[in-house]
Amino acid sequence: MSKPPPKPVKPGQVKVFRALYTFEPRTPDELYFEEGDIIYITDMSDTSWWKGTCKGRTGLIPSNYVAEQAESIDNPLHEAAKRGNLSWLRECLDNRVGVNGLDKAGSTALYWACHGGHKDIVEVLFTQPNVELNQQNKLGDTALHAAAWKGYADIVQLLLAKGARTDLRNNEKKLALDMATNAACASLLKKKQQGTDGARTLSNAEDYLDDEDSD
């Protein structure tokens, strides 16, 4: 029984596959790749020939070859982030794999980078202009919850400096501060929350004075 064909690429999305066999091109515009190579498919508009990139080279690949002789990688950026594989992560981003894509748990690649303590991965993801800091997964956890729970104070600090929210509660009504497993993370989160609350109090006081002045 043959595998069902992969779903077509939506605009702005990239399909990623791992080659199970080497493909030898017959014409100059076809793409050569070897067993185990990662292929990024960017155009499936032609049903017979798909446009793909592998190791920085772009070319055409027979669609039936990809469907039958390659393994689909559903969340390559997440896999790279989980493993702390920086070169693969950069390659995914270079090939326009979406930085804010969600896996089955509703988590982003940033969440998994924070969960695994991969500071270098977090820093690279932060270079993406539209990276979403505060995405909550199906458990309601954000990247900040993950970093606090795992005790990675350096990553908590990075997230806070980038503007991650400390007031988001997960499905168990817990803030990132409630999940902090060491004093360093708790201290950073407390300080940030006190600063936020202080700024809010000051803002409210200014609004009150403005109202008094307008009377």
From Swiss-Prot:
> Keywords for this entry?
Acetylation, ANK repeat, Cytoplasm, Phosphoprotein, Repeat, SH3 domain
Query: Could you tell me which residue ranges the SH3 domain spans?
Result: 12-71
Instruction: List the record's Gene Ontology CC terms alphabetically.
Output: cytoplasm
The source's domain of life comes to Eukaryota
Q: Which residues carry this modification: Phosphothreonine?
A: T201
- Annotated positions of the N-acetylserine modification: S2
Q: Where is this region: Disordered?
A: 192-215
InterPro entries (UniProt xref):
Ankyrin_rpt, Ankyrin_rpt-contain_sf, SH3-like_dom_sf, SH3_domain
In this chain the ANK repeats are located at 72-101, 105-135, 139-168
**A Pfam family it matches:** Ank_2
Principal localisation: cytoplasm
User: What PROSITE patterns does its record include?
Assistant: ANK_REP_REGION, ANK_REPEAT, SH3
User: What SMART domains does the record point to?
Assistant: ANK, SH3
Q: Name one GO molecular function term.
A: SH3 domain binding
Positions modified as Phosphoserine? S203, S214
The subcellular localization recorded is: Cytoplasm
Per the record, what about its domains? The SH3 domain mediates interaction with SMN1.
- Oligomeric and partner information: Interacts with C-SRC and SMN1. Interacts with FASLG.
Free-text function comment from the UniProt entry: Induces bone resorption, acting probably through a signaling cascade which results in the secretion of factor(s) enhancing osteoclast formation and activity.
What name does this protein carry? Osteoclast-stimulating factor 1
Which species is the source of this protein? Answer: Mus musculus
